[in-house]
A protein has these predicted regions:
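Membrane engagement elements in two modes
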Residues: 1-55, 83-92, 105-107, 111, ...
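Conserved beta-strand and immediately adjacent loop positions that scaffold enzyme active sites
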Residues: 58, 76, 124
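Asparagine-centered strand-capping/turn motif at beta-strand->loop junctions
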Residues: 59-66
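Hydrophobic side chains in beta-strands
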Residues: 61, 71, 79, 127-129
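Short acidic, flexible loop segments centered on an aromatic residue
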Residues: 66-86
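Residues that flank catalytic or metal-binding motifs in active/ligand-binding sites
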Residues: 73, 95, 121
């Protein structure tokens, strides 16, 4: 017996309407598509900079390529030679995040839980837009700390369309 794809058109329509229904810009909607490739590491620029909030680093990824591509919706942020990476807040799994040509996405990373009574120190952190990338290393001075970066239970927001939304997402998730 042959199974008909009765749900194919409604599902495709729902995915197409997702940006409209959620208010998300079309360039940001993360519906998986075989036609959109993972951004090549050389086609994206990653930055990390100091935030006005203590122990928070602002990161960004920009698509320098000529076509839309995807990165993982959870930035990969590691700290020196410590095991593990910053955990996403809110908790989320891997999924594609679309970046139009020339577009940027932003995230906020809290390196140190304010309630922490202990911490580790590292000389650098590494940021990548996708776990398949090696990432870019940023020294302590480039993220606004003197000498070392204090780390304990680090968290990161998902990629956001603006730095302000990344800051708001971190504030909401870490109250």
């Amino acid at each position: 017996m042959r199974i008909r794809p009765a749900f194919a058109a409604p599902a495709a329509t729902a995915l197409a309407l997702l940006p409209v229904l959620t208010g998300a810009p079309a360039a940001v909607a993360a519906a998986p598509s075989a036609a959109v490739a993972v951004c090549r590491e050389g086609a994206v620029t990653v930055t990390a900079a100091r935030s006005a909030t203590p122990h928070v680093v602002r990161i960004s990824v920009t698509n320098k390529g000529g076509a839309t591509c995807v990165v993982d919706r959870v930035p990969t942020v590691t700290f020196g030679d410590l095991d593990g990476a910053a955990q996403p807040v809110p908790p989320a799994g891997s999924a594609p995040y679309r970046l139009a040509a020339g577009a940027s996405a932003y995230a906020a990373v809290r390196t140190l839980d304010p309630a922490a009574e202990e911490s580790r120190t590292v000389a650098y952190l590494t940021v990548s837009g996708d776990p398949s990338h090696r990432g870019t290393r940023f020294g302590a001075a480039s993220v606004g700390t003197s000498g070392t970066i204090r780390v304990w239970e680090p968290v990161t927001t998902l990629w956001q369309p603006t730095a302000a939304k990344a800051d708001a997402a971190l504030a909401a998730a870490t109250r």
